[in-house]
């Protein structure tokens, strides 16, 4: 069989392409869904797909302290069709962010992100709290339902040069 330079080059390019595809798929790490909350720390290419998250704080639980559906820190990745909601308990006063993203780059594709205050708690918090992060959102819904005039619920808090597009 004659050594064909074009065939040889095409074969080598195919091998390189296949190797790059394997590396790319190895870097993209699927994140396990947990209905009470997801934490992503120090991951590059993290992917959370079709997950419903509703963190809860027991009625007798602390009225202060962190409560988040998704915490992403020092990471990059995608959230695809994630439904993250927080129903504020009656005793909850402060320090919650449904989505807490710090030092990360995230693409959000689809999903519903919501805060409800059915117990009319005198509460404050954020739907999205971004700290030194870049977030790009596509086809997502952001909902806040609160009838208590004393509570302060905000959709977005952008801190430390964060960017939301």
Where are these regions (language model features)?
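Gram-negative bacterial Sec-dependent N-terminal signal peptides
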Residues: 1-27
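Extracellular beta-strand/beta-solenoid scaffold signature
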Residues: 31-39, 54-71, 85-100, 115-132, ...
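Beta-strand repeat architectures
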Residues: 44-46, 70-77, 105-106, 135, ...
């Amino acid at each position: 069989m004659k050594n064909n330079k074009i065939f040889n080059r095409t074969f080598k390019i195919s091998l390189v392409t296949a190797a790059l595809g394997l590396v790319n798929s190895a870097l993209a790490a699927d994140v396990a869904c947990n209905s009470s909350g997801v934490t992503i720390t120090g991951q590059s290419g993290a992917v959370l797909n079709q997950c419903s998250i509703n963190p809860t704080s027991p009625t007798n639980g602390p009225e202060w302290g962190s409560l988040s559906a998704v915490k992403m820190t020092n990471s990059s990745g995608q959230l695809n069709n994630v439904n993250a909601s927080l129903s504020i308990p009656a005793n909850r006063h402060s320090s919650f962010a449904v989505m807490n993203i710090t030092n990360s780059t995230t693409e959000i594709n689809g999903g519903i992100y919501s805060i409800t205050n059915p117990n009319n708690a005198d509460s404050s918090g954020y739907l999205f709290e971004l700290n030194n992060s870049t977030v790009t959102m596509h086809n997502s819904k952001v909902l806040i339902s609160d009838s208590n005039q004393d509570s302060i619920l905000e959709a977005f808090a952008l801190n430390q040069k964060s960017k939301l597009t």
